[in-house]
Amino acid sequence: MDFLSEHWLDILTTILGLLYIVLEYRASIALWIVGIIMPALDTWLYWSHGLYGDAGMAVYYTIAAIYGWAVWRFGRKHGQQTGGQMPITHMPSRLYIPSLVFFAVAWAATYYILVTFTDSTVPLLDAFTNALSFVGLWALARKYIEQWFFWIIVDAICCYLYIVKGIPFKAALYGLYVVIAIAGYYKWKKMMKQ
């Protein structure tokens, strides 16, 4: 019983995370509803384990999920007929450099905040995953297929971090996320051609 009382939030957010990734894999707009609830709960989980960057990122995810839902529901790409959801597309090459610059600035800023204002024991990796997650979530909201590449990297590093920090269910979830992100890329690629 001690195990469950110690890990109940980890278990709950892991279940929600499984639902989220299945919905993302299917390119279902319902992913954004789960994407509001899960990170709201993750905020407390991460904070209680000293993953302050991840806690801050979870707050961002909660807010960004509202944006993602609105873009998927009401946004349209150039040339798309009115109505329907936004199609899956490639990230325009003109956005590569700005995305890389944003990532680098976000990584440096997050690292500085974690080192200066927290007692984080993993500031470099925590900041890295947070900065890349900003870019990944933006790419997901725009329905760019390349978002999967960002998540493969983020998920692999987070799996390691959660093992180190003693959050076993999240670690297993993020290990599974790596596999699903690889499969998701190919699924979305197939969906793009339909």
Roles of regions detected by a PLM:
Residues M1-A27, L31, M38, G75-G79, ...:
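Polytopic alpha-helical membrane-helix bundles and their juxtamembrane interface segments
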Residues I15-L19, M57-I66:
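Alpha-helical transmembrane segments and their immediate interhelical/interface regions
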Residues M38, G53-G56, V71, F169:
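Short, flexible micro-motifs
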